[in-house]
Amino acid sequence: MRKYIFIILIAVLLIGVNIKKIAAAANIDRHTNSTLGIDLSVGIPIFYNDLSKAYPTNLYPGGIGAIKYQYHILNNLAIGLELRYMFNFDINHSFNILNPDSSVGKIFYSVPITFSINYIFDIGELFQIPVFTNIGFSLNTYGDRNNNITNLRTFDALPTISFGSGILWNFNYKWAFGATASWWMMFEFGNSAKMAHFALVSLSVTVNVNKL
């Protein structure tokens, strides 16, 4: 009997603690606050497809950096702008990663510029789960990195959309650290309509500039 009473008391205590954390999370005030974020990511080319089938991208995983600005129109809802930079080496062309200036390979570069919508689910006071989507366009170039002659390189601007989620640890009321994962799609229209797919895994840092 004492054992069951002890278990019930522990359960009541845990429930009380969780209720307090949930109440604290509900009281987190971000309304009208602005945040800045930085991402360091690995961009993994998955595939591209046309209307009939999917094809390999023939690109290595590459690096990505991003800077993000968001404004909270509601406590848990934010809108903002995001600028990313991405590069991927072509598998079919050799390069020397230790001496990139001597490489003769081709590289795909992309600069996505997007509008973002982010909804945040708070888990107590310690964690937050952002669910986000981005829409905008990407400035892309592909070709021989050692030759800037126009006919050896391609340039285009493609509509871009993404969606993703993650988890961030609230270090304090100013800073949060964590990781996110997202799926990015770039669209090419016209007679040879195609869609490229990239998976991004990111380490993220955000700061509430109103709290600084």
UniProtKB/Swiss-Prot annotation:
Membrane topology category? Single-pass membrane protein
Query: Which cellular component, as a GO term, is one annotated location?
Result: membrane
**Location(s) in or outside the cell:** Membrane
Tell me which UniProt keywords the record has, alphabetically.
Membrane, Transmembrane, Transmembrane helix
Give the main localization category.
Answer: membrane
> Which residue ranges traverse the bilayer?
5-25
Q: NCBIfam families under this entry?
A: OMP_BB0027
Protein name as it appears in the record: Uncharacterized protein BB_0027
Native species: Borreliella burgdorferi (strain ATCC 35210 / DSM 4680 / CIP 102532 / B31)
